[in-house]
UniProtKB/Swiss-Prot annotation:
Protein name: Pescadillo homolog
Reported induction: Induced in malignant astrocytes following the loss of p53. Induced in hepatocytes following partial hepatectomy.
Record-level GO BP terms: fibroblast proliferation; maturation of 5.8S rRNA from tricistronic rRNA transcript (SSU-rRNA, 5.8S rRNA, LSU-rRNA); maturation of LSU-rRNA from tricistronic rRNA transcript (SSU-rRNA, 5.8S rRNA, LSU-rRNA); nucleolus organization; protein localization to organelle; regulation of cell cycle; ribosome biogenesis; rRNA processing
Record flagged with keyword Heme: no
An example molecular function term from Gene Ontology annotations: ribonucleoprotein complex binding
Length: 584
């Protein structure tokens, strides 16, 4: 009565997947082109739940794709472009072999090319979706922008990545969107808040590159090809939101100031890019009519809503204060410090920054300027100090941004041992170990005295105690004899008094026992908790025990870290003490 009986592996999960080779043959593409197409379209392999069924009983290692994804790729117009490019390469190779140079030039002029605009719109229907997926795009573009001009990747790709990243940095500076910075072994982590979306990316340090051989640069270049298109769309929309020219243009005043030294630093074709990359000048805005923002009406609300609004207002005020952290301060960067990272951070928080004119284009004032408040140095004793400015190490700038306030500069003077650089991306929960430096920072944020001089006071007390030991020993020898005599007299009198009191009948006064309400409440709560645990089901009790075991383990780990830190501090303190007492 039913339909035709289907054979094995022709229904169920076996029909939902297709192997990579079958998919490649269906699309009539080579393996590199198939990989490229999947990267551009965002199609990734899937691991079936029942791999043996999908693999028709075989256990061989194979890569599977969803068959609906492959059907989706069949209608992609880029597939035809890939085939046209294969024909173009074949014709070009034949023309080179026959030395037909006119045909070579004609073929190069008619080289097939394609655009990824429709793919970007397809993968990110809204602008917020694009912002949420911008982390990897920024990290990859910042990486490619630092590559040297070698045969590993095209020069045009490197230049495009450099231009797009500089444009994004200028947007962050203009919008004051930077929130957190962290120096790590891999590079510098940044976090910016763009239209309410947190975006985190990593920028590598400006070191010379030694390209590893175990990396597939073609795959990375394919990702970069898509990411550059995406970042171009995003930059255009972001510049529009701030009424900025796109492509970006410097303000007329900044262009006039740098026009004198234009021929010295770069060619006419590169000078504008060099000035933009300096990050020292502001961007020109599109003149638009000013629109007065309507103030929101305030209505009487409940107490809870009012408290939430007050907390929100305080948070916004703190955020606005954080955006103006370096406002009114003028910085000068020495040659040995990372110029681009510091210039980007300082300008993102309203500060003015400059450097030596021979170092890079875009310097706005000299080292002799009397208005300089902070000079960033990393080599102590290299310059003659100028009165009226602070000389600090670069870490001070990064720590101030993460602390949301201007930290004391005493610990960051040149030659000083720097405090630990705490990560702003770590948030301690209840029961976690909090290092003493984080506690001091929290105290500073609350406006309290963190007590930086506790260790020095303890060391001074130890020294004073050592000096007083000899004098106290002499006094103790004199007082020992008199104390022993007094103790014997007191002991004899106490025995006599006790013997007399035993002969007399005594009436002891009763004591009123006051109930400790807090202790009783705790006992009732613990008893109720014990009864609740007894009434739990077996599965619930097992889950509860796992939760409590995790909490106890976290407490043990926190205590272990605290003990290690205490042992380290004691060792450092004893080492300092030994150095101080050692004869010169």
């Amino acid at each position: 009565m039913g339909g035709l009986e289907k054979k094995k592996y022709e229904r169920g999960s076996a029909t939902n997947y297709i192997t990579r080779n079958k998919a490649r043959k269906k699309l009539q593409l080579s393996l590199p082109d198939f990989r490229r197409l999947c990267i551009l379209k965002g199609i990734y392999p899937h691991e079936p739940k029942h791999k043996k069924k999908v693999n028709k009983g075989s256990t061989a290692a194979r890569t599977f794709y969803l068959i609906k994804d492959i059907k989706f790729l069949l209608h992609e117009p880029i597939v035809n472009k890939f085939r046209e490019y294969k024909v173009f390469v074949r014709k070009l190779r034949k023309a080179y072999g026959k030395s037909e140079w006119n045909a070579v030039e004609r073929l190069k002029d008619n080289k097939p090319c394609y655009k990824l605009d429709h793919i970007v719109k397809e993968r990110y229907p809204t602008f917020i979706d694009a912002l949420r997926d911008l982390d990897d795009a920024l990290s990859m573009c910042f990486l490619f922008s630092t590559f040297p001009r070698t045969g590993k990747c095209h020069v045009q790709t490197i230049q495009l990545c450099r231009r797009l990243t500089v444009e994004f940095l200028h947007y962050v500076i203009t919008a004051r969107a930077l929130r957190k910075v962290f120096l790590s072994i891999k590079g510098i982590y940044y976090q910016a808040e763009v239209l309410g979306q947190p975006i985190v990316w990593i920028a590598p340090y400006a070191f010379s590159h030694d390209h590893p051989t175990d990396v597939d640069y073609r795959v990375m270049a394919t990702f970069t090809e898509f990411y550059t298109t995406l970042l171009g769309f995003v930059n255009f929309r972001l510049y529009q939101s701030l009424n900025l020219h796109y492509p970006p243009k410097l303000e007329g005043q900044a262009q006039a100031e740098t026009k004198i030294s234009e021929d010295t630093y770069a060619l006419d074709s590169e000078s504008s890019m060099e000035k933009l990359a300096a990050l020292s000048a502001s961007l020109a805005r599109v003149v638009v009519p000013a629109i007065e923002e309507a103030e929101a009406d305030e209505f009487p609300t409940d107490g809870e809503v009012t408290a939430q609004e007050e907390d929100r207002k305080k948070e916004l005020e703190a955020q606005e204060k954080h955006k103006k952290l370096f406002e009114g301060l003028k910085f000068f960067l020495n040659r040995e410090v990372p110029r681009e990272a510091l210039a980007f951070i300082i300008r993102s928080f309203g500060g003015d920054v400059s450097w030596d004119k021979s170092l890079c284009i875009g310097a706005t004032y000299d080292v002799t300027d009397s208005c300089i408040t902070h000079q960033i140095v990393d080599r102590p004793g290299q310059q003659t100090p100028i009165i009226g400015r602070y000389y600090v190490q670069p870490q001070w700038v990064f720590d101030c941004v993460n602390a949301r306030l201007l930290l004391p500069v005493a610990e960051y003077f040149p030659g000083m041992q720097l405090p630990p650089h705490l990560s702003p991306f770590v948030s301690e929960k209840e029961g976690d170990y909090i290092p003493p430096e984080k506690l001091k920072l929290l105290a500073l944020q609350r406006g309290e005295d963190p007590g930086h001089l506790e260790e020095e006071e303890e060391e001074d007390e130890d020294d004073d105690n050592e000096g007083d030991v000899a004098a106290e020993n002499e006094e103790e020898d004199v007082e020992v004899e008199s104390e022993e005599e007094e103790e014997e007299e007191v002991h004899l009198s106490a025995l006599e008094q006790h013997r007399l009191e035993e002969k007399k009948p005594q009436v002891m006064a009763g004591t009123v026992k006051l109930e400790d309400k807090q202790r009783l409440a705790q006992e009732e709560e613990s008893e109720a908790k014990r009864l609740a645990i007894m009434m739990m089901k077996k599965r619930e009790k097992y889950l509860y025990q796992k939760i409590m075991f995790g909490k106890r383990r976290k407490i043990r780990e926190a205590n272990k870290l605290a003990e290690k830190r205490k042992a380290h501090d004691d060792a450092v303190r004893s080492e300092k003490k030994a150095k101080r007492t050692r004869p010169v």
